[in-house]
Amino acid sequence: MNFPDDLRYTSDHEWVKVLDDGKVRVGITDFAQSELGDIVFVETKPVGTVLKQQDIFGTVEAVKTVADLFAPVTGKINAVNDALDAAEIVNSSPYDEGWMIEIIVDDPEQVNALMTVQEYKKTVGE
């Protein structure tokens, strides 16, 4: 499985990439997409939605299950990935084309408190 070193991770199997200007990009990990199986639909809250850390910001629907998506940080949704209309992109490219939302972060320390790649690998038994 692939777990990029430059990302932060959550116990809910989401990744966070720090962008410019206090924003982060969020998606689900390779482990999560593998566990879910074939993803057929992704729904997220719209741009402008204010989230608190751990708020549900959307759902991922796979052939065998539906999973909630949890905000890894507090902030406001700044962008939603239009490519999610073809939800299978999350299976084929969870870290690049299959990202889900971008958030303008209220408190950068929340990002720093997320798991490193080494910590996340221990969580998933890698």
Swiss-Prot record:
Stretches of the chain forming a coiled coil according to its record: none
Keyword list, A-Z: Lipoyl
Cofactor note: Binds 1 lipoyl cofactor covalently.
Residue ranges of every copy of the Lipoyl-binding domain listed in the record: 23-104
PROSITE patterns documented for this protein: BIOTINYL_LIPOYL, LIPOYL
Cofactor: (R)-lipoate
List of residues that carry N6-lipoyllysine: K64
Known partners and oligomeric status: The glycine cleavage system is composed of four proteins: P, T, L and H.
Entry similarity comment: Belongs to the GcvH family.
NCBIfam families, A to Z: gcvH, PRK01202.1
Record HAMAP family: GcvH
The name this protein goes by in its record: Glycine cleavage system H protein
Native source species: Chlorobium phaeobacteroides (strain BS1)
Taxonomy of the source species: Bacteria, Pseudomonadati, Chlorobiota, Chlorobiia, Chlorobiales
